[in-house]
């Protein structure tokens, strides 16, 4: 079942934690690629100095952050790696959750090809398929084309995992500082990164 629009409403930190254990799905050329979300970071603009929308900054890139919750915010870092975010909070409040790592589930062969141009890969390469925001976007075929797409779409959405299959019974959620935001002054220390402690696909322990 797809997460309904109401899933993305409410406090961004709570939505971030709710996303853990759910499945991010992208249909590419009719083939489902997906992974269980195991690591996220919350960004609470306009007061969060780590957020692109800090100070209410509106640009062509950040405009989608000011829109309705439950949409995709995709951007490039270093001019080459895509990052996928889920927009949260009411219209006009530019907040979102960065998906940092997944455990691959569906379309594994397509994911391997997208990452390594081959399907015969080592154990180390398998562990590196989706353990970072740029890696998971490449694996799932998420690009700037998906920016602003509603997560009620047939081709890009969050699939709710039934309680009996949910990995929350196996892993404890841990909170800590976000990664690679050294510019963000006091926001560097906010414990707004949430992840499953000990999960092999988490990007950084």
UniProtKB/Swiss-Prot annotation:
<dbReference type="InterPro" id="IPR036995">
    <property type="entry name" value="MPG_sf"/>
</dbReference>
<dbReference type="GO" id="GO:0003905">
    <property type="term" value="F:alkylbase DNA N-glycosylase activity"/>
</dbReference>
<dbReference type="GO" id="GO:0003677">
    <property type="term" value="F:DNA binding"/>
</dbReference>
<dbReference type="Pfam" id="PF02245">
    <property type="entry name" value="Pur_DNA_glyco"/>
</dbReference>
<keyword id="KW-0227">DNA damage</keyword>
<keyword id="KW-0378">Hydrolase</keyword>
<protein>
    <recommendedName>
        <fullName>Putative 3-methyladenine DNA glycosylase</fullName>
        <ecNumber>3.2.2.-</ecNumber>
    </recommendedName>
</protein>
<keyword id="KW-0234">DNA repair</keyword>
<comment type="similarity">
    <text>Belongs to the DNA glycosylase MPG family.</text>
</comment>
<dbReference type="InterPro" id="IPR003180">
    <property type="entry name" value="MPG"/>
</dbReference>
<dbReference type="InterPro" id="IPR011034">
    <property type="entry name" value="Formyl_transferase-like_C_sf"/>
</dbReference>
<dbReference type="GO" id="GO:0006284">
    <property type="term" value="P:base-excision repair"/>
</dbReference>
